[in-house]
Amino acid sequence: MEASRQVRVRYAPSPTGRLHVGGVRTALFNWLFARKHGGVFILRIEDTDLERSTEESVEQLKRSLRWIGLDWDEGPDVGGPHAPYRQTERLELYRRAARRLLESGAAYYDFATPEELTRFRQRARAEGRPPIYTGGPYREMDPEEALRRVRMGEPHTVRFKTPREGRTVFEDIIRGPVGFENATIEDFVLLKSTGTPTYNFAAAVDDAEMQITHVIRGDDHISNTPRQIMIHRALGHELPAFAHVPQVLGPDRKKLSKRHGAASVEDFAEQGILPEALFNYLALLGAGYAADEEIFAPEELAERFRLEKVSGNPAIFDEQKLLAINAVYIRRKSPEELAMLAAPMLSERGVADAGELERDMPRLVRIMELLRERLQRTTDIPEAAGYFYGERLDYDREQFEKQFGKEFVRENLPELYRRLKALPEWTADAIESCVRGLAAEKEKGARHLIHPLRFATTGRTVSAGLFETMELIGRERCLLRIADVLERLQSPERSL
């Protein structure tokens, strides 16, 4: 490949369902490689599997890529010099390429029925040979006779005439030299009996027509590579470079799936992972970046990306590391941004009334400023912010008895309630001064009042700073909750 050629890479998914995290990582590696080298990133939709490909999946796929922050220079919605970018709209291109291969003798019409193919493979197994189809009588059939049968409407496929000797070898940027014995590769189908192309044929033709310089894809495609190389050579194409990215596995070293908690972009979005955090984490996963840092902007990741540094071993997905990165990105968001994220969640979960949230957005901004250091997922927000809204709380019985069972607390909580109620200003400083003042009068550490007061006002034993929290909960709610605790203490039979 000429060194002066502009880098052109493609991400070419089949739209058959949600976008798996392994596919997103492959897309990211293509995008990073293109951006690093000032190249072109192409999105190509490989939708020739008409039974499984759906328009809904195409749209979902594009949404997922855009959500995580990927843009494409050529492809659906943006066009480009090699349009169209959906394989079902490029069928004539594949048929022309097939005719060229037929005319050159590199391919042939195959009329074998499914029953013939089954018998061929059974016989090969019985004779101790690999069940590899090599064309039978059709491989060397007179081209004129084959064409006559085609014109008569006889069902057929078009197969590649695989060399029976030698090896097909390529240099994988990630794995090094990879080779296949040609004798182990059967005469593979190029065009199905329906006239639609197979994956290998369409991919090779498209890669050449779109001038792809580097094919960066999952390692489940390694066995496809010799077939595509054969097609390229038979058509006189310049070969792209190949790099096969290992799979993403769960901690149990099995392919990451829903049983591990999340597997698709949508899963992670639904579980409160920010797009920039998922981008950052997946770009680092098995990519060979120096371990001294973990948080990078996309431009920094592209600048540091080295395809040859990508590990040849499967990448093990570490949810805790992703959550740690996600927490960093949550902390980097402004309280205003977090409030915009939080409002619909709080309303949908029934934590707060939509009208109240809209009327008092500045308060929600302050709540998010208080809570953001404690969040790992955005979906933590409704639980974390719940005690700022509503009136009375549901208290855990065991913890209630632990917090209010001590004589000092029972004796002094009523006085604390009276002093808090009498405060002229409901501010964190005023609340703190009140609590610490009473504790000092009683010659006790402030913690003897702070812990039960936290539980009374939030229903939690752990929260953000108590006094700031009480200020934001508000005087009315705090006093109502403390009064509720006092009433329960006076009436032990009252249910929690």
Swiss-Prot record:
- Class in the EC hierarchy, top level: ligase
Q: What is this protein called?
A: Glutamate--tRNA ligase 2
One GO location term (cellular component): cytosol
Q: Which family does it belong to?
A: Belongs to the class-I aminoacyl-tRNA synthetase family. Glutamate--tRNA ligase type 1 subfamily.
Per the record, the GO terms for biological process are: glutamyl-tRNA aminoacylation
PROSITE patterns hit by this protein: AA_TRNA_LIGASE_I
Described function = Catalyzes the attachment of glutamate to tRNA(Glu) in a two-step reaction: glutamate is first activated by ATP to form Glu-AMP and then transferred to the acceptor end of tRNA(Glu).
Q: Which gene encodes it?
A: gltX2
Which amino acid positions bind ATP, per UniProt? 258
The record ties this protein, via CDD domains, to: GluRS_core
Q: Which reaction does it catalyse?
A: tRNA(Glu) + L-glutamate + ATP = L-glutamyl-tRNA(Glu) + AMP + diphosphate
Q: Where in the cell is it found?
A: Cytoplasm
Domain of life assignment: Bacteria
Motif mapping: 'HIGH' region: 13-23
Which keywords, in A-to-Z order, does the entry hold?
Aminoacyl-tRNA synthetase, ATP-binding, Cytoplasm, Ligase, Nucleotide-binding, Protein biosynthesis
Lineage at the top is:
Bacteria, Bacillati, Actinomycetota, Rubrobacteria, Rubrobacterales
Q: Which residues form the signal peptide?
A: none
Gene3D superfamilies registered for this protein in UniProt = 1.10.10.350, HUPs
Alphabetized Pfam families for the sequence: Anticodon_2, tRNA-synt_1c
Q: What is its EC number?
A: 6.1.1.17
Its assembly, as annotated, is: Monomer.
